[in-house]
Amino acid sequence: MSRQNTIADAMSALKNAGDCGKPECILEPSSKLLGAMLRIMQDAGYIGSFDMIDDGRGGQFRVHLSGRINKCGAITPRYSVGLDELEYWETRYLPGKNFGLLILSTSRGVLTHNQARQNGIGGELLGFVY
């Protein structure tokens, strides 16, 4: 059975493992986009370390959880967002001002909504975490 949305599967696996109190979570299949999203979550402190495991099929990420994820999810469809529209999406998906992150795919790579605002660019919404 093929997977339709690997980012949504990974985000729900992270949330479910965090809710159960597990110390780590295995995400498969791996991709560069998912790795970039995990790097952003790690830099913000929502997850601990993670490493890529090459199993000869699709690859896996082993993510060590820190217990700081309240909720995370993928945003589908991937809405195109301009710089002036970021505040609307921030109020729609995040519970409060300066709380949580929107993750965007931009022309300069995968960034948070704060980094995109500082760079003055928009992009496509991938997910959120708080």
Swiss-Prot record:
Any GO molecular function: structural constituent of ribosome
Keyword NADP: no
Keywords: Ribonucleoprotein, Ribosomal protein, RNA-binding, rRNA-binding
GO cellular component: ribonucleoprotein complex; ribosome
TM helices/strands, residue ranges: none
Pfam families membership: Ribosomal_S8
Any one of the GO BP annotations: translation
PANTHER family: 40S RIBOSOMAL PROTEIN S15A
Family: Belongs to the universal ribosomal protein uS8 family.
Subunit relationships: Part of the 30S ribosomal subunit.
NCBIfam families per UniProt: PRK04034.1
General function of this protein: One of the primary rRNA binding proteins, it binds directly to 16S rRNA central domain where it helps coordinate assembly of the platform of the 30S subunit.
Protein name: Small ribosomal subunit protein uS8
